[in-house]
Amino acid sequence: MSAREKPSSGLVGAGLLIVDKDAGVTSHDVVARCRKLLGTRKVGHAGTLDPMATGVLVLGVERATKLLGFLALTTKAYTATIRLGQATTTDDAEGEVVASADASGVTDEEIAAQVHTLTGDIQQIPSSVSAIKVDGRRAHALIRAGEEFELAPRSVTVSRFEVVARRTEGAFVDVDVEVECSSGTYVRALARDLGIALIGVGGHLTSLRRTRVGPFTLEHARTLEQLAEEPGVSLDIDAAAQTAFPHRQVDADEAESISQGRWLEPIGIKGVYAAIDPSGHTIALLQERGRRASSVMVVRPATLR
């Protein structure tokens, strides 16, 4: 951190915080706790995790909250346990049981075959208890109000869906899986659909842990308890931008120019990328359109340099 960066600049303490979320708390609970621990209201999160789920949750702190809208968190990875033979209202363990069936006779080969059909580019109906909007209202709110509705299938990509262990629990079968998928994929819906395909009764998740979001993994993450012992971001704003985006080196004159909102000559990089000055600081996020590489976010405007 440069000595020129004053506390009032919003750059001191700015960066991404990667939290290993505990079960039983909401993503908003995590944000509220981090605001207290870091002593700032400027904390936001990218994406959410269900209360039952644990694992990687990406937060922005101070000026880095503006990075969140540009992060390409389009791929995610999970470990999960699916219970076959029992369907719930939420497709996870937090819901009420609505149907049961004996799954003990399901073979490993049958499970593998149906897992295969749920892998690749698929059409998935999201879980009904979700944040998806139906006529302007959240699906989970409609469920609580007792209203009936149907969610349309969505195109999602499940690049990996692998069974790593199986256990028989009486009439139920618990299957440990690893999933890599596109943003918008509901692992709860995979559990539901696997159960329906195998025994006619939707399965549900008994555990879910997110191990990766985009380039951010559990290796970057800290629990709230660890954060309380040593408050601070996981990646400062420079490391965050350079981890999350492709980058381009710029000279001092170019850095000064884009810090004042001017554009540079394009060099053929697709999508949003970071412009890095000779000292290693991220000056701006740029995007090329036609004959210009223009800023979509100035990380270090001239007034803060």
Curated annotation (Swiss-Prot):
GO terms for molecular function: RNA binding; tRNA pseudouridine(55) synthase activity. GO terms for biological process: mRNA pseudouridine synthesis; tRNA pseudouridine synthesis. It holds the Pfam family TruB_C_2. Keywords: Isomerase, tRNA processing. It catalyses: uridine(55) in tRNA = pseudouridine(55) in tRNA. CDD domains: PseudoU_synth_EcTruB. PANTHER family: PSEUDOURIDYLATE SYNTHASE TRUB1, TRNA-PSEUDOURIDINE SYNTHASE. Responsible for synthesis of pseudouridine from uracil-55 in the psi GC loop of transfer RNAs. Belongs to the pseudouridine synthase TruB family. Type 1 subfamily. This is tRNA pseudouridine synthase B.
